[in-house]
Amino acid sequence: MRRRPAWLGVPGKDADGAVLLTGPEAGELLKAAVEHAGGGLVDWHLDHVDANPGQSTTATYQARVQWPAGERQELFGMSARASGPAVTDSRADIYVDGSREVAVWRYPDDPDLPGLSRAAYPEQMAAIISDLNLVGARVSAQQINLHMIGYRPRRRAVLCVEVNNRRFYVKVLREGI
């Protein structure tokens, strides 16, 4: 009989994933996700939790990852739902065994904020600003100063964009909102 991984929790308990995603077992799942992506997990800590008791839990983690090109600080997210994965969870990696299913993603590839992966990179933001003619001229990624103001995983993100002595705030929302 195959041993059940600790990160799956006890069958029938912790349906919303709160215990798993806020406890030390989250590290095992994070390690599996990082290795699946081609890296090695150096260390990690819980960053943020959004809980809907009995329904779902989403957590983010700050992680130091050793990639083939070097070590980087990364932000990972995980979600578990009592009712099983949502349609948008298919945009993340799903770890499954038995009844436990956990969606895992690396920022900015939030499964409920598909626009975030476009807004979070200077190259993509330069194209948006240029296409919308927001500063009266085409801009390059080198002209963009971009930083995250706030991020609520699976809900919204706000970024500050500075270019040509102008400042813009970009809010990324879920589809249909």
Predicted feature residues:
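Phosphate/pyrophosphate-binding loops and the adjoining catalytic core of nucleotide-dependent enzymes
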Residues: 1-177
